[in-house]
Amino acid sequence: MGQKINPNGFRLGISTDHKSRWYADKLYKSYVGEDVAIRKLLSKGMERAGIAKVEIERTRDRVRVDIHTARPGIVIGRRGAEADRIRGELEKLTGKQVQLNILEVKNPEVDAQLVAQGVAEQLSGRVQFRRAMRKAMQTSMRSGAKGIRIQCSGRLNGAEMSRTEFYREGRVPLHTLRADIDYGFYEARTTFGRIGVKVWIYKGEVAGTRAERQAQAAARAGVPGRGGRPQRGGERPSRGSRGDRPTRADRGGDAPTSEATGAATEQAAPAPAENQEG
């Protein structure tokens, strides 16, 4: 089952989250159509921006759109002109106030969607598919990925019959639910037809569900002190000022001096025996 299913949907609530977060009763159909139209609008004409994913969150009178991109300067434009244009088109499409957030992808070499888009662009530029796949795998592994698999399907190198080829490096455990696997898909448009590019990137294992990890992080942030131990208040008293500890004099009598101790030692010592004449 793990080999065929979409890894993002297979791990919802464990290592991934929904890309659209809202609730609707009677307007469910129209909201789904709006989400598809929003993503299609953002992908059209934004191929050079390197958009990894688009997250949509709705309230009663507002729509929040988060764009994760590798090149935020292209999406923002000069003095924010491009961002204003996108916001205006989204408000016209949805009929509500739109809050547009543009977020930068810190490490695009280990983002599956961006890797798939990069391979597809090379295939469109008549680069050998094996060379493009191996170069992408080497770059991802050097950037910190623990495993990667890239698959290309279509008329590879202009062959008469379409076929599927893939390359893999490292571990890609698709059946393991706690494995953090990123998945991306992109289509390359060539003179021989379209070639589909799929990418799986294994980033390591996660402990517990997504909600449990957030609760643990909040608990760690709320505990004072270092290392989860509460800090001790006040100063530690010195050795000579420890409260009302009784001294030897209070317990009865003064402490024996060195002279008295020496006299007692002499009295206790046995006298040497005298030699007796036979």
From Swiss-Prot:
InterPro entries from the UniProt entry: KH_dom, KH_dom-like_a/b, KH_dom_type_2, KH_sf_prok-type, Ribosomal_S3_C_sf, Ribosomal_uS3_bac-typ, Ribosomal_uS3_C, Ribosomal_uS3_CS
Alphabetized UniProt keyword annotations: Ribonucleoprotein, Ribosomal protein, RNA-binding, rRNA-binding
Gene3D superfamilies: 3.30.300.20, Ribosomal protein S3, C-terminal domain
Region (Disordered) location: 213-278
Amino acid composition bias (Low complexity), ranges on this chain: 214-223, 259-278
Residues annotated as domain KH type-2: 38-106
PROSITE patterns per record: KH_TYPE_2, RIBOSOMAL_S3
GO biological process terms, semicolon-separated: translation
SUPFAM superfamilies for the chain: Prokaryotic type KH domain (KH-domain type II) (SSF54814), Ribosomal protein S3 C-terminal domain (SSF54821)
Gene Ontology CC entries for this record: cytosolic small ribosomal subunit
Keyword RNA-binding among UniProt keywords: yes
Any GO MF annotation of the entry: rRNA binding
Record's function text: Binds the lower part of the 30S subunit head. Binds mRNA in the 70S ribosome, positioning it for translation.
Subunit structure: Part of the 30S ribosomal subunit. Forms a tight complex with proteins S10 and S14.
Protein's recorded name: Small ribosomal subunit protein uS3
Native source organism of the sequence: Nocardioides sp. (strain ATCC BAA-499 / JS614)
